[in-house]
Amino acid sequence: MPCVQAQYGSSPQGASPASQGYSYHSSGEYSSDFLTPEFVKFSMDLTNTEITATTSLPSFSTFMDNYSTGYDVKPPCLYQMPLSGQQSSIKVEDIQMHNYQQHSHLPPQSEEMMPHSGSVYYKPSSPPTPTTPGFQVQHSPMWDDPGSLHNFHQNYVATTHMIEQRKTPVSRLSLFSFKQSPPGTPVSSCQMRFDGPLHVPMNPEPAGSHHVVDGQTFAVPNPIRKPASMGFPGLQIGHASQLLDTQVPSPPSRGSPSNEGLCAVCGDNAACQHYGVRTCEGCKGFFKRTVQKNAKYVCLANKNCPVDKRRRNRCQYCRFQKCLAVGMVKEVVRTDSLKGRRGRLPSKPKSPQEPSPPSPPVSLISALVRAHVDSNPAMTSLDYSRFQANPDYQMSGDDTQHIQQFYDLLTGSMEIIRGWAEKIPGFADLPKADQDLLFESAFLELFVLRLAYRSNPVEGKLIFCNGVVLHRLQCVRGFGEWIDSIVEFSSNLQNMNIDISAFSCIAALAMVTERHWLKEPKRVEELQNKIVNCLKDHVTFNNGGLNRPNYLSKLLGKLPELRTLCTQGLQRIFYLKLEDLVPPPAIIDKLFLDTLPF
């Protein structure tokens, strides 16, 4: 491929780089004794390896073919600039040209320039007769313009300083950069920048622009340049790693919630299930640490703190209770003997020891917890429309309204508790007559037990099954003295800090127990034993029996207290029937008659 090789003559003896000049003749030719012999070799060889480049500059002959130093066409084009140190080579070719623009104020393209797709070929021009330039030292950084003569001055001291700093090899593909100035910039100047790795940007610049070479500025005014005939897009030849950075797409982000579920506790992204429930890694770790350390938390509010992704760390008590409420099973958390041994059995003990109790039936306790959670109102959807913190119960309304409210609360809870009973494993397998008998006999006990576990006796706040919230004083005229016994039982129950798994077992045992007139009492007894064993294993595996002696006995001791409270409730219904201010609903009347002990 034909190319152009620059052949520079030496400067006159004693000429310095700071005193070189150009002279422009009327014929359009340039004359130059450009550099000292030391600088003649500075023709783009930055290290000892040759740098070959096929120029892609437009109409190179327009700028250079009339210099006093001749240009000959030789294949291939070789520019050499010796520099102390090692050598490296760079080959710039096949640079695609874009945005070719022919300016109307320039003469048409001559046949000396023959563009090619990717490279530019030049027709050889006749070498002009060398002329002897007049050397004149210029201390001004700008060019003088005396008519048709243009004296060129550059501060090559900075260039020499730059050469001394370029003694390390220059990496390939990092020497040239071709840029395009911002839109609207006049296209009357050409910029060459040698900054670090050699960059040769061919940009249109404003008039009188300054060129920086390692911190030194060279001012080149407009009169020395010919107007550019082509506009170039920004072409950047950089390191290969830089090119790859713009071509290789970034990997897709991990943890996208598109194909993942949500944590049942806080609503964060959850990839899989932990301890029986789909939860996030944060709630899984919190639940595991709490169970392994047998941590006890205290709620500083009303035990109904919101637990979501943003506020899950505010109240540990409410977060742990929600973990239990959604069905996370403490029995499946690894104990000390299995901690950190994913899927491996503990090492065989050296001395014989008592066999550990079998793990509780996870399916049974999980089903009991799930049934309890599904039958309780959500703390975020409670009905406070009728709640009054300090009501004047003696003046608000008459007895008829309070008695009707009492009956409505009982009947509204009955359907919810019946739905809870049908979800207990094994209960639906009993005869229908036994199911009805067990439910009707234990309804008032379950009503009191569930009400006492949900309510806040310290504030006198009662939360019923249908989500209605009332103050204790609002229930006195309807419930009578029974409400005081319920609040006292609630206070004692919550002082025991019963977790939701143990409470679910106690609630099931309150219904699945021995009753008169059962058709298949043996099957009821078997189901009762399963629930008792489940509760016993739960207490044992959670170290409740070690830290709190007779804890299981205290839990089971709440069942006789419920029988007493149930009797008080029957007495209240009997009193209201005798008062006959409001007739009881048929279902309450049947319940009262079926549960009479005589």
Swiss-Prot record:
DNA-binding segment(s): 260-335
Residue stretches of biased makeup (Pro residues): 352-361
SUPFAM superfamilies found in the cross-reference section: Glucocorticoid receptor-like (DNA-binding domain), Nuclear receptor ligand-binding domain
Location of the motif Nuclear localization signal (NLS1): 338-350
Biased composition (Polar residues): 7-18
Function text: Transcriptional regulator which is important for the differentiation and maintenance of meso-diencephalic dopaminergic (mdDA) neurons during development. It is crucial for expression of a set of genes such as SLC6A3, SLC18A2, TH and DRD2 which are essential for development of mdDA neurons.
Family in the record: Belongs to the nuclear hormone receptor family.
Localization (cell): Cytoplasm; Nucleus
GO biological process, one term: positive regulation of transcription by RNA polymerase II
Lineage of source species: Eukaryota, Metazoa, Chordata, Craniata, Vertebrata
Coiled-coil annotated residue ranges, if any: none
One Pfam assignment: zf-C4
Placement of sequence motif nuclear export sequence (NES2): 568-577
Broad class of the protein's primary localization: cytoplasm
Family annotation (CDD domains): NR_DBD_NGFI-B (cd06969), NR_LBD_Nurr1 (cd07071)
GO cellular component annotations of the record: cytoplasm; nucleoplasm; nucleus; transcription regulator complex
Zinc finger (NR C4-type): 263-283, 299-318
Entry domain remark: The ligand-binding domain (LBD) contains no cavity as a result of the tight packing of side chains from several bulky hydrophobic residues in the region normally occupied by ligands. NR4A2 lacks a 'classical' binding site for coactivators.
Protein name from the UniProt record: Nuclear receptor subfamily 4 group A member 2
Short sequence motif named Bipartite nuclear localization signal (NLS1), residue ranges: 287-314
Assembly: Interacts with SFPQ, NCOR2, SIN3A and HADC1. The interaction with NCOR2 increases in the absence of PITX3. Interacts with PER2.
Keywords: Cytoplasm, DNA-binding, Metal-binding, Nucleus, Receptor, Transcription, Transcription regulation, Zinc, Zinc-finger
Family annotation (InterPro entries): NHR-like_dom_sf, NR4A1-3, NR4A2, Nucl_hrmn_rcpt_lig-bd, Nuclear_hrmn_rcpt, Znf_hrmn_rcpt, Znf_NHR/GATA
GO molecular function, one term: protein heterodimerization activity
